[in-house]
Amino acid sequence: MTSKTSADLPATAPAVAGTSAFVLVYHRSPFDEKIDADGTRHWVDQKSPNGIIPTLRNLFRSQRSGTWVAWRRQDEEGPSDDELVQMDPPNDFMLRRLPLTTKQISSFYHVTSKESFWPILHSFPSHFSVDNSDWCIFEEVNASFARA
């Protein structure tokens, strides 16, 4: 698997925004990233408790090309470029990882998504909770996914 930032790819690469025939947007990556002591990166199957990751990965089997858009946690001072990773066959798709800070992940995912939307979408309106102070971060993160 090759890791690059979007600036490293030629304009005709399939992972350039708006050019993939099939795009899947999901908050988690299709594989967990493991980095050895020598800096070598490996991708391993996720231990998804509900099986959604393997199911979503299977969607790419019938596609000639595609891009999976997910986030990656970044340090506050770290590089903020999107990362593009060409996954090896049989997972022949691009992984586009959007950099999100710990604060963005907490606000977007743990607060707004899990406490506000999930209870309603899963028919538990009594568990609905909202904190409008997180809404601007939710919009910011969604805009990043939309641009990808």
Briefly describe each language-model feature range.
Residues 102-148:
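Conserved nucleotide-sugar donor-binding subdomain of glycosyltransferases
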